[in-house]
Curated annotation (Swiss-Prot):
Domain ASCH: residue ranges: 6-101
HAMAP family recorded: ac4C_amidohydr
Coiled coil, from the record: none
Catalytic activity line of the entry: N(4)-acetylcytidine + H2O = cytidine + acetate + H(+); N(4)-acetyl-2'-deoxycytidine + H2O = 2'-deoxycytidine + acetate + H(+); N(4)-acetylcytosine + H2O = cytosine + acetate + H(+)
Catalytic site: K21, T24, E74
Complex and partners: Monomer.
Superkingdom: Bacteria
Descriptive protein name: N(4)-acetylcytidine amidohydrolase
Amino acid sequence: MQPNDITFFQRFQDDILAGRKTITIRDESESHFKTGDVLRVGRFEDDGYFCTIEVTATSTVTLDTLTEKHAEQENMTLTELKKVIADIYPGQTQFYVIEFKCL
């Protein structure tokens, strides 16, 4: 079995597969992905593979510079997005936006 390159919480799987979630915001430990990378995607909870994505763009962002567009690309409100990011990465402020499409 091939290892997954990136994982997402299971609660995001349906939005990714439906094309409603088209970015992910990560910390420095996952800042190495580049435009054009093709990644196997698994669920964080059980590492089960569920799709393959292609990275279409990357950029940096801070918690304070997150926008409504980021929230729309994450399929949530800006308030929800800031809370999710703060819950996943407490105390951090610098993040990496990975834009992607399902293949």
